[in-house]
């Protein structure tokens, strides 16, 4: 069992660590307060070549087989300081993976290189106002008409939806067939009938806008049907969500490390009861528990990303991706809460980053499958004997 990173992965981690410390850490609080997409951070990513880590090399990216672990490493480093900046990197994979998995050759050649080069941004549209965890219940409708598809419906809570040049969405082409009647579409922002209906006000992760997208007789050409085939989108939905779950886990892993490191530095300096509070066993045990959770989350996250890189992201391996996502994101919430507790009243104040880490962490247990949905996936794998213990 080899736990060594490749030379390229080590370079990516070191590069991203330097970028995070130099550019992102000083901007993190400001990004949260301004609630504006940090274009300067995006340009830093672009210049560093970090926008195509999961996009195959044949389409302008740098992925030759280890891209998801590379992206997880990069996101982990960034999320130590700013979870929103980590989400920006995730959004190079989430909207493009459906095209990688199910797109035509023409779609791959058209829509993947601009993301890898930083010439475009993209978003992913699955969730609707009345369809979240039950993805098969989406109500957006696409009807073929005169060589085009006319789309009607809404997509809710879409990360980066207001800054995206195109959105990869899913809609019903055969409503009676439920999940077997779902198709994917690539919708450029210039499409007639497409609009950003609302920007949401959020508790955390404020640097990446979240939008309600409206499709009112939105017309896209027939060649924008993902894969050129109707009613085959749901398999792509599942493959995409499974693929990016280790990246969400990496956001949690990085956030937890950042929160713990800040609290530890504080505890070593804060004097109480005759010395630094880091000398108190009660505080030491809190940090020991943080380390246990973080190191377990690290192994699960890296393993999950490695599985995706091996092509193991379909049903028989989905439970391991769910284990990683659920554990790492819940670790982020627990560790950020305990780190805030170490600071006491100071941790509750905006003078310190821990209140932001805590707000940001809470998002992670919801996106790309709630913690409860992941427990459903894991328990089903156990009952179906996909997950077998001797």
What role is predicted for each listed range?
Residues 1-85, 102-107, 114-118, 134, ...:
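Alpha-helical interface subdomain recognition
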Residues 93-102:
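Helix-loop "lid/cap" segments that line or gate small-molecule binding pockets
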Residues 49, 75-79, 171, 187-192, ...:
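Short Ser/Thr-interspersed hydrophobic loop/turn segments at strand-loop and sheet-helix junctions
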Residues 118-126:
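A short, Trp-centered hydrophobic/proline-enriched beta-strand micro-motif
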Residues 90, 115, 130-133, 157-160, ...:
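Short Gly/Pro-enriched turn/cap motifs at secondary-structure boundaries
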Residues 147-148, 152-196:
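A short core secondary-structure module
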Residues 137, 190-221:
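Flexible, small-/acidic-enriched active-site or ligand-binding loops
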Residues 216-235:
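Long, acidic (Asp/Glu-rich), low-complexity accessory segments flanking structured domains
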